[in-house]
């Protein structure tokens, strides 16, 4: 609500929400300026031309706007329209929250009870919370947690969806799904955050350089097919380039540098999908279109991991996958090939990691 810049949506929330806090916050964000007597007379004068031939030189849009101003009695805008405009926000949603949404249950909004922490507890919070990032895990560790309020899950779900639809924010991030699939589990880490646009789940202090393959370049227009071999080669060049970027990057925090060099995370994605579908005469969302998209992304995923395995042979695996002994390295590699994501990869890719290791902990990211 604090980032909403559309007064019409704020008014919709006020009129269609039953949660008192949402209504209060929407009202606080909404700004109303009543019409002066002069403005009211001006708009009324415009409306008076509504039923006169030629509309007095005004068009329908101007007359409708004048009617709306008179109906509302003023102009709606928002307070602090520039609030956090330079930041993208995502909301982490848990399985428990989605269960509450599906079953129309109440949901507790919980957070560490920092207001009642002792100085010692606050020091632990400042040092450790960002590494955990999950109030459920924080509570399991024995730290104090407070229920700040209870809300109907569907009210919050509807708020998120309305704001995302009409303001492109917040992003929706299913954190339990991310942790079930992430390769970071192999080396004892977990997802606690995302990058600004929400496409890259991140462990504490993780950073990830991003790149995109232009899919439109791989359409064979005469045959309306895809040049998969050229796509594979481009992906492999892209992975090699991004691995080089990791070493060429200036890091502002030592923790970022340690994490970046330790897991060597890269995010290769795509652009130009719509153009490719047009060139191949496939409709977006159709069965044929979806089959083509599946094949394209399967090709990219396999090629990227094959390239990283080759780099692992040349340059060594990412350090977090290297143990102090051969047995420890083998254990880490086995854990890696059994993450939620890697279980979906072809057997030859998993076997390649077991035998040669892999240069990068993560490889694929499609930006929104």
Residue ranges of model-derived segments:
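Structural helix-adjacent loops and short alpha-helical linkers that scaffold large soluble proteins
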Residues: 222-232, 282-286
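A general alpha-helix detector
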Residues: 159, 272-276, 292, 307
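Structural motif
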Residues: 201, 260-265
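Active-site cavity-forming subdomains of large catalytic enzyme subunits
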Residues: 1-215, 219-228, 251-255, 304-325, ...
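Internal maturation/activation junctions in enzymes
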Residues: 112-118, 234-257, 261, 283-368
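Short coil-to-beta-strand
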Residues: 205-211, 237-240, 271
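Contiguous, well-ordered alpha-helical segments that form the cores/surfaces of helical PPI scaffolds
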Residues: 212, 264-279
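Short glycine- and Lys/Arg-enriched binding-loop motifs that mark or flank ligand-binding interfaces
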Residues: 164, 184, 263-265, 366
